[in-house]
Curated annotation (Swiss-Prot):
Signal peptide feature range: 1-26
Organism domain of life: Eukaryota
Entry-linked InterPro entries: ApoC-1_sf (IPR043081), ApoC-I (IPR006781)
Pfam families attached to this UniProt entry: ApoC-I
Protein name per the record: Apolipoprotein C-I
GO cellular component assignments: chylomicron; endoplasmic reticulum; extracellular region; high-density lipoprotein particle; very-low-density lipoprotein particle
GO biological process: cholesterol efflux; cholesterol metabolic process; chylomicron remnant clearance; high-density lipoprotein particle remodeling; lipid metabolic process; lipoprotein metabolic process; negative regulation of cholesterol transport; negative regulation of fatty acid biosynthetic process
Molecular function via GO: fatty acid binding; lipase inhibitor activity; phosphatidylcholine binding; phosphatidylcholine-sterol O-acyltransferase activator activity; phospholipase inhibitor activity
Miscellaneous comment text of the record: Apolipoprotein C-I is present in acidic (APOC1A) and basic (APOC1B) forms in P.paniscus, P.abelii and P.troglodytes and perhaps also in baboons and macaques. The two genes for ApoC-I arose through a duplication process that occurred after the divergence of New World monkeys from the human lineage. In human, the acidic form has become a pseudogene sometime between the divergence of bonobos and chimpanzees from the human lineage and the appearance of the Denisovans. Pseudogenization resulted when the codon for the penultimate amino acid in the signal sequence was changed to a stop codon.
Gene: APOC1
Localization: Secreted
Length: 83
């Protein structure tokens, strides 16, 4: 009885496997994949440049740069006096 049930299942499985992938499941074209990758890279580059320019122009970063400059000058002056 088991053989009687397993043979049709085996035939169906083999027919599905030997049929190959469906057109929608076929391997994508390499050039389209590279185009998508290039588009993603360009988008990422644009967003990164925009973020960097926002950071450079923000008030917080200007205050931080000023604070670091002042602190660095104070440290330099202390080191000159001590030496």
């Amino acid at each position: 009885m088991r053989l009687f049930l397993s043979l049709p299942v085996l035939v169906v499985v083999l027919s599905i496997v030997l049929e190959g992938p469906a057109p929608a499941q076929g391997t994508p074209d390499v050039s389209s994949a590279l185009d998508k990758l290039k588009e993603f890279g360009n988008t990422l580059e644009d967003k990164a440049r925009e973020l960097i320019s926002r950071i450079k122009q923000s008030e917080l970063s200007a205050k931080m740069r000023e604070w670091f400059s002042e602190t660095f000058q104070k440290v330099k002056e202390k080191l000159k006096i001590d030496s």
